[in-house]
A protein has these predicted regions:
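Transition segment at domain starts
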Residues: 12-34
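Short, surface-exposed charged micro-motifs
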Residues: 6, 25-27, 99
Length: 117
């Protein structure tokens, strides 16, 4: 049910996981989804998200390919603890989980959880 200021869900709620297109620059479209996954086939740059809305939150699963040791660099709107981009797990097929919350349209606060399986 919904009111002008609140929405209540009795039961569970789920959102799909959108597959990001792998390429030299990866662009997450926050206007289309909250949750994403990407398998890295090389060192990549994650561009600033398109269509970010303050209060939006979600998850990006980052998967190493069979080679592993892939790296990511990040657009200037992504904010990490200590203003330092995190280091990904490097094993072949490793999975890391980036949890994010859009604080403002120019600040996406993030935390990386390494090697979740």
């Amino acid at each position: 049910s919904a009111s002008p200021t609140k929405m209540y869900v009795n039961g569970s709620a789920a959102a799909t996981i959108n597959v990001l297109v792998d390429g030299a620059t990866v662009t997450p479209y926050f206007s289309q989804n909250n949750n994403f996954t990407i398998t890295l086939a090389g060192n990549r740059t994650v561009a600033n998200p398109v269509g970010a809305t303050p209060g939006q939150s979600g998850t990006i699963y980052i998967v190493q390919d069979a080679t592993g040791s892939r790296t990511l660099s990040w657009g200037n709107l992504w904010r990490f603890q200590g203003n330092t981009a995190p280091t990904l797990s490097t094993s072949a097929n490793a999975v890391d989980m980036l949890v994010y919350s859009v604080r403002t349209v120019s600040n996406v606060s993030c935390q990386l959880i390494n090697n979740i399986g």
